[in-house]
Amino acid sequence: MLQCLFFVMDPVFLSEITVELVKHSASDSDVVFSARVSTLGSFVAVTDCLSNRDIGLITFLMRERHGSPFEHSHMTFRISAPIFVFREFMRHRIASYNEESGRYKNLDPVFYIPDEKRKLVQIGAPGAYKFEEGTSEQYGLLIEEMKELSLAAYDTYKRLLACGIAREVARMILPLNLYSTMYVTINARSLMNFLSVRTSRANSAFHSYPQREIELCADRIEEIWKGLMPETHAAFEKQGRVAP
């Protein structure tokens, strides 16, 4: 019964996705020495200074899709996003995930609402559709309904907990726009696979049409990764954003 005493936050509505790099072992040199062990054995020198030959090797590996050398770079991200984004993210069974638990802690009343840049109207059939701007009336209705339902659901959640109902049962009432937090650990090869389908770029060999919210998440991750492994990222771009 004490769990009902731990609600200290007022409800918050946000329109952003946050991504933070927690730790990493990721550099372009990881790719180089991992690949060269194939021909040089234990005589591979590990260095962060890349030669033109090293950069050429990275490009070759990407172009010919020799992927395993890209698996030796790892990154751990802390991500805060609405639950529906995580459900899409975790379809990529190529990373390690640990998420905030609604069984073991009271969930905070932080909810996602789209900003005014979010296109609202779907035109066309599944697999061949596009999104267009909605009207101000549609946007106003959406935000009003989302806020009202989010607050009502959270009030019910608190009442259920106050009556002694277990967290893992009470959480069933909460909506998908509730924010959660997770840690994701992923290697560079798997990350490129994720980016190839969760971002939309004109230079992609295979065009993808991700939901806007997970693309916002992917964009932030890619910007961090680009800073860690710029030559690998450049090769990824050059080869049409196809994961090796």
UniProtKB/Swiss-Prot annotation:
Chain positions of motif ThyX motif: 91-101
Pathway: Pyrimidine metabolism; dTTP biosynthesis
Record-linked SUPFAM superfamilies: Thymidylate synthase-complementing protein Thy1
UniProt EC number: 2.1.1.148
Single GO molecular function: thymidylate synthase (FAD) activity
Positions annotated to bind FAD: S68, R91, H92, R93, E99, N187, A188, R189, N193
Catalytic reactions of this protein: dUMP + (6R)-5,10-methylene-5,6,7,8-tetrahydrofolate + NADPH + H(+) = dTMP + (6S)-5,6,7,8-tetrahydrofolate + NADP(+)
Cofactor binding note: Binds 4 FAD per tetramer. Each FAD binding site is formed by three monomers.
General function of this protein: Catalyzes the reductive methylation of 2'-deoxyuridine-5'-monophosphate (dUMP) to 2'-deoxythymidine-5'-monophosphate (dTMP) while utilizing 5,10-methylenetetrahydrofolate (mTHF) as the methyl donor, and NADPH and FADH(2) as the reductant.
Protein known as: Flavin-dependent thymidylate synthase
Lineage: Bacteria, Bacillati, Actinomycetota, Actinomycetes, Micrococcales
